Amino acid sequence: MAGDSRNAMNQDMEIGVTPRDPKKIPKQARDYIPIATDRTRLLAEGKKPRQRYMEKSGKCNVHHGNVQETYRYLSDLFTTLVDLKWRFNLLVFTMVYTVTWLFFGFIWWLIAYIRGDLDHVGDQEWIPCVENLSGFVSAFLFSIETETTIGYGFRVITEKCPEGIVLLLVQAILGSIVNAFMVGCMFVKISQPKKRAETLMFSNHAVISLRDEKLCLMFRVGDLRNSHIVEASIRAKLIKSRQTKEGEFIPLNQTDINVGFDTGDDRLFLVSPLIISHEINEKSPFWEMSRAQLNQEEFEVVVILEGMVEATGMTCQARSSYMDTEVLWGHRFTPVLTLEKGFYEVDYNTFHDTYETNTPSCCAKELAEMKREGRLLQYLPSPPLPGGCAGAELEAEAEQEGEDEPEGLRGSRETRDSV
């Protein structure tokens, strides 16, 4: 009996039946309801609300919890300090200098205490280690003067104190190291090009429409500054959870979206707003996705724009994302570039605007089959003819051109118009 039940359980696992103990399923997989099918499992949405993987501002919604090996942050202390928020960075900056001043001030006071200088304050015949050092406060002030190299005034070290000379050398060297480390952290944090990404824009929506009789996923990018991004490049990834045929659940699986890295179109000359296009072909993850399936799928497209800041030469990165609800089928972007007298003008008021266009509702795979069979034109709605007097004038001009054409060209034109 035990062997039969074990065989039955193994058979259930092979055909994709849900295990009887839900606690053995990972937490990420329990958020979805598996549906048993023949040799595979499909994922149905659970009751858990949708969550963006990346905000429109570029911030990733990923929190690292239960980190056990926190000592790894100290192994790269410089990067840890640079990544801190400004209030914590300033707090560390102040505390490091204050602690070093207090530490060496205590040592100066300890030397004076051991030598007996504190018992001979005001004695003209006594030669102390540090003149006019009467207590811990004066030792602390002397430590600040030594480390910041602002110059000695009322308090000064004497040559009759070898231990003081050694301490002076040690504090001077360690003070230089602290200055280099802390000032370097502040300089790197100030010069970070994060704010440069604030002037790089992404359209609020992505669109899917026809380009050269092929379905394309498109979004628009722009740069508000007159100083350009050097060596700008764009890439995109599809974030979508999936389940393999063996039943393995892969949360937030990342798939590359080709935006021209095989042809060099991903290298941008970002002087004016550009429309980034992804051709939906056999290698695209949207190859079999129709308009109806777009409304049912759950995915997120993450776009990353990288380049060097022209003024500083530092690498800058801007990010954004598009949920499935932010992808508009059958839309195109409104043009923003106009030609003026002697220059081109960009109207950013219409940067995010789109308009509807004639686009088939079928997937790119079916569209390619129609094109091979010659049935594509009958599925594309023709644009409306102009009405009124303008339409009559156009028809009259067309008839006049038809009479002037040779017989062979006229027949070919009639055949093309009928198609």
From Swiss-Prot:
Keywords: Ion channel, Ion transport, Membrane, Phosphoprotein, Potassium, Potassium transport, Transmembrane, Transmembrane helix, Transport, Voltage-gated channel. GO terms for molecular function: G-protein activated inward rectifier potassium channel activity; inward rectifier potassium channel activity; voltage-gated potassium channel activity involved in atrial cardiac muscle cell action potential repolarization. The chain crosses the membrane at residues 87-111, 164-185. Residues 407-419 have a biased composition (Basic and acidic residues). The gene is KCNJ5. Associates with KCNJ3/GIRK1 or KCNJ6/GIRK2 to form a G-protein-activated heteromultimer pore-forming unit. The resulting inward current is much larger. A motif (Selectivity filter) lies at residues 149-154. Residues 1-22, 382-419 are annotated as: Disordered. It is a multi-pass membrane protein. This is G protein-activated inward rectifier potassium channel 4. Residues 136-147, 148-154 dip into the membrane without crossing it.
